[in-house]
Amino acid sequence: MDVLHILQTNFVSIIIGFVVIILLWMNRGKQSNSRLPPGPAPIPLLGNLLRMDVKAPYKLYMELSKKYGSVFTVWLGSKPVVVISGYQAIKDAFVTQGEEFSGRANYPVIMTVSKGYGVLVSSGKRSKDLRRFSLMTLKTFGMGRRSIEERVQEEAKMLVKAFGEYRDSVVNPKELLCNCVGNVICSIVFGHRFENDDPMFQLIQKAVDAYFNVLSSPIGAMYNMFPRIVWCFPGNHHEMFAIVNKAKVYIQEQAEIRLKTLNISEPQDFIEAFLVKMLEEKDDPNTEFNNGNMVMTAWSLFAAGTETTSSTLRQSFLMMIKYPHIQESVQKEIDEVIGSRVPTVDDRVKMPYTDAVIHEVQRYMDLSPTSVPHKVMRDTEFYNYHIPEGTMVLPLLSSVLVDPKLFKNPDEFDPENFLDENGVFKKNDGFFAFGVGKRACPGEALARVELFLFFTSVLQRFTFTGTKPPEEINIEPACSSFGRLPRSYDCYIKLRTEK
């Protein structure tokens, strides 16, 4: 009887405790959350997670936008997340009220790597100072040094050579494209390219690959929601953190080597430029130019600049396999404008069709449907709702890239979406492939140069064909918790007839 009484008492205590937890959760921040935008009712502790596909959360957001409109709230566990959908609302938030929405939310996978340092995850003064420096450094690389264009042209030449070794045979282009894009970043960060079999180059490439594998995986999604719990379990996230740390150590070692022979009047690479800035501001107690920010800003160039650009190129060539007539039209324009010489950035304005194809690949691919999460920097009024300071905010870029009011054929791959009736390239205000506002991709200019020069240099020499008929090729990007990435594919690379 005593045992039964004890069990009954414990059971009742558990039930009461559970009810108390639910009531506390339901009333947590009730006053501050009372004017949040509407959204689906959350389940205690889990929020709206049971309704969400962790590999494609943007699909739920697109569905909810039809019901709740351009501003709504979802709950990731116990945290409210405000989603902003549609061109006008996104512009109003991230451009018109850009300062309020300019913060970077805590994204645990990235935060564990960065410890809060670097341009990608920081907010406020740190973000502004590092972003301004990065943009200016990349922009001025052509002054007294090899220009960005020359660096990309060199890698394009190496890529053509590498593809030539596989002509008339089956190849998966992923590694070749990752290597050439990775070496562009190496040339900027370290001042020189690496051979593909160099151990340090392979370390960096493996670190970037591991980083995005975790970001794109279910365990990465769970880590971002429950970091302390997931940290306690085995998984590839531990291996990823270890190899990324090795890459960070290598960057630090390279900085220490350069510091010994640094010419402050003529820095030769990104690291040296950062070191010069550190020396200039060494007596400023509020400076953001320190070792931690140097290493993480350099790492961010690899993390943000390698996978995104190489993935877009992979998707581009997959589209050429799927649509041979589009590939032929691009090659015709290449022959007419460039001929057999080396492609240059100046050629782009004379090649509206090719430019439209590249833009359409980015629009259709929709690489990052919600961008990297933002947060509001202070209590913010938006569309008659109250968003408390620190709340995570997601711009639903997908809602703009498939808006029929902005694009003629939003559900199809159609370069005409970026051409007028005369075949002239037409800019589109809804082209948010690089994000929008104060946190738009700082490497956009570099990415545009890479996409154009790599794409034209390769199609100038080669034609891509599939291992199966075009109608059987799936061009829909594979969804992951990070974004929409191209599917793995094999193809034939055939040498074109000399013109």
Curated annotation (Swiss-Prot):
It is found in: Endoplasmic reticulum membrane; Microsome membrane. Its EC number is 1.14.14.1. It catalyses: an organic molecule + reduced [NADPH--hemoprotein reductase] + O2 = an alcohol + oxidized [NADPH--hemoprotein reductase] + H2O + H(+). One of its GO terms (molecular function) is iron ion binding. Keywords: Endoplasmic reticulum, Heme, Iron, Membrane, Metal-binding, Microsome, Monooxygenase, Oxidoreductase. Its main location: endoplasmic reticulum. One of its GO terms (cellular component) is membrane. In kidney and in liver from juvenile and sexually mature trout from both sexes. Pfam families: p450. GO terms for biological process: lauric acid metabolic process; lipid hydroxylation; xenobiotic metabolic process. PROSITE patterns: CYTOCHROME_P450. Its cofactor is heme. The keyword Metal-binding applies. It is a peripheral membrane protein. PANTHER family: CYTOCHROME P450 2C44 (PTHR24300:SF346), CYTOCHROME P450 508A4-RELATED (PTHR24300). This is Cytochrome P450 2M1. It comes from Oncorhynchus mykiss.
